[in-house]
């Protein structure tokens, strides 16, 4: 890399490490709340103005109400019998991260796909910032292309890089600088 290197990890640099156990308690209780399919009282774990920042397809939700109306409700309408399974969690001061899956039944319309009744897995990663016992920020990556593939929709039209793994296409090589 030429030139100055960008600043790294600026958001978590000055985290208060004495808050690790408090953060753990908030996240564990919140995941239990999600598994109980709570919507109306989920504010127990989030500030009114918290930010939920998702990848394309998920969108960004500004505040608790948008999260409830534009994420939780449509998600629970599309997927029933949903169980969140964090496969790993990390805690560091006011920060927490997890990756895992939600096992669910596709029982409502999702991204234009009518209900199939299929049992699917929804993979995700979450990064949370907790202050004063509540989540203020949540960065989220949900693997919607994988969800849609399980429902018979290939968003990459056969050109996902898995085609290189299957030797169906040749992976391009970088140009030399």
Which residue ranges define each predicted feature?
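Beta-strand elements of well-folded, non-transmembrane domains
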Residues: 35, 104-106, 130
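Short, solvent-exposed aromatic-acidic interface loops
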Residues: 139-148
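Hydrophobic/aromatic beta-strand elements that line small-molecule binding cavities or substrate pockets
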Residues: 85-89, 123-128
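A solvent-exposed, acidic/Ser-Thr-rich amphipathic alpha-helical stretch
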Residues: 40-94, 101-103
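Short, structured motif recognition centered on aromatic/hydrophobic residues
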Residues: 23-27, 35, 52, 71-75, ...
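Short, low-complexity N-terminal intrinsically disordered segments enriched in polar/charged residues
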Residues: 2-48, 156-177
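Hydrophobic pocket/interface hotspot
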Residues: 27-30, 41-43, 50, 67, ...
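A cross-kingdom feature marking solvent-exposed beta-strand/loop segments within repeated
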Residues: 56, 106-120
